C-alpha cells in the first residue's frame, strides 16, 4: 500500500501544469499507477489526488454505506462521483489542474503538496500555511487523543 508523507512546495505554470514532487512521483510509479483521480476535497479548499486503486476502495466503501433506493443517497453518490477528473502525468511528471479547480481552490503559482496517508492534497500555498496548529496546541491535542485511546483500550481489556 502506498503511503504519502511530507509537505512539499511546487510551482504551477500559467496553464495550471505542476510537477508532482519527485518523492510522490516515485511512489506512484513504483505502484504502477498511471491514472490518478482528482477531486475537490469535501470539507476544505484543496484538491485531493488519489491513486486509482485508492479511489476505487473509497468509492466502494461509500457505495456500501449508501442505499441505492434512497433518493438522498443517490444524490450524494452522484455529487461525489461527478466532480472528478481523471488525470495522467505527462512524460515530465506534470499534471494539469483544470481551470475550475484552480478557481475554487485559489491555486495560482505557489502550490503545496501534502502527503496524507494514501492520498495527496494540493493546496494554494497561502491557504496551506494556515492549516496547522501551533506546536504546543498540536502536542496537547495529540496527547489528549492518545490518552483517550489508551483509556478505551485499557477498559476493553478489563
Curated annotation (Swiss-Prot):
- Tell me which UniProt keywords the record has, alphabetically: Cytoplasm, DNA-binding, Repeat, Transcription, Transcription regulation
Q: Give the main location.
A: cytoplasm
The keyword rRNA-binding is assigned to this record:
no
Q: Which GO terms describe its molecular function?
A: DNA-binding transcription factor activity; transcription cis-regulatory region binding
Q: Where in the cell is it found?
A: Cytoplasm, Nucleoid
Q: Where in this chain does the record put each SpoVT-AbrB domain?
A: 7-54, 84-127
**InterPro entries, alphabetized:** MraZ (IPR003444), MraZ_C (IPR035644), MraZ_dom (IPR020603), MraZ_N (IPR035642), MraZ_sf (IPR038619), SpoVT-AbrB_dom (IPR007159), SpoVT-AbrB_sf (IPR037914)
Tell me a GO cellular component. Answer: nucleoid
Q: Which GO terms describe its biological process?
A: negative regulation of DNA-templated transcription initiation
Q: How does it assemble?
A: Forms oligomers.
* Assigned protein family: Belongs to the MraZ family.
Read off the HAMAP family from this record.
MraZ
Q: What is this protein called?
A: Transcriptional regulator MraZ
Q: Which organism is it from?
A: Bacteroides fragilis (strain ATCC 25285 / DSM 2151 / CCUG 4856 / JCM 11019 / LMG 10263 / NCTC 9343 / Onslow / VPI 2553 / EN-2)
Amino acid at each position: 500500500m502506498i503511503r504519502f508523507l511530507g509537505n512539499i512546495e511546487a510551482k504551477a505554470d500559467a496553464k495550471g501544469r505542476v510537477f508532482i514532487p519527485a518523492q510522490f512521483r516515485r511512489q506512484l510509479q513504483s505502484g504502477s499507477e498511471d491514472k490518478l483521480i482528482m477531486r475537490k476535497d469535501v470539507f476544505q479548499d484543496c484538491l485531493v489526488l488519489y491513486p486509482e486503486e485508492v479511489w476505487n476502495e473509497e468509492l466502494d466503501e461509500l457505495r456500501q454505506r449508501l442505499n441505492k433506493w434512497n433518493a438522498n443517497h443517490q444524490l450524494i453518490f452522484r455529487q461525489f462521483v461527478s466532480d472528478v477528473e481523471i488525470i495522467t502525468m505527462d512524460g515530465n511528471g506534470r499534471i494539469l489542474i483544470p481551470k475550475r479547480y484552480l478557481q475554487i481552490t485559489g491555486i495560482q503559482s505557489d502550490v503545496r503538496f501534502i502527503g496524507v496517508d494514501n492520498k495527496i492534497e494540493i493546496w494554494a500555498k497561502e491557504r496551506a500555511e494556515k492549516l496547522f496548529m501551533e506546536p504546543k496546541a498540536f502536542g496537547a491535542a495529540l496527547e489528549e487523543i492518545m490518552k483517550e485511546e489508551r483509556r478505551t483500550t485499557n477498559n476493553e481489556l478489563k
